[in-house]
């Protein structure tokens, strides 16, 4: 979010859970008008303390925000859980105001830890993380770009969260790059 602290923003978070991201926005942008969509009723009730939260499934495409359009729509580790992430992005794009942006955090299945496990014959789901057992879709950097293009969105700023990458991981990535057409090591993070 690049506006000044006093900007009167309209922000919508899809899958807002208990509202932690929306609370961060409110703390940094006190004039922001906050909205959320959350499928879990208990979490929606909590988030409703700081935002106008609609309890429901965004994929049913029946949201009514009273004609309000948004400066930002946030998808924080949500798209990989949806049956139709592209359709949902297209639907939500209709709620953006002119010049509005979608902010998304999407796990990279081409992460060095997943690739290392794959070449050793493992693709083990977990209760959280890159291989969360509730993920329906998996994306690589290139697949994220393709999905955005198909939905008529443009990637303006993409950043990789490089957490817990060891020197051994970096050396492994260098070897992978020698074997592949990938020329940007960040695609493995």
Spans of features found by a protein language model:
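Helix N-terminus capping/helix-initiation residues
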Residues: 1, 57, 180-184
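Conserved SAM-binding loop
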Residues: 2-116, 140-145
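S-adenosyl-L-methionine-dependent methyltransferase catalytic module, highlighting the catalytic core
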Residues: 20, 83-189
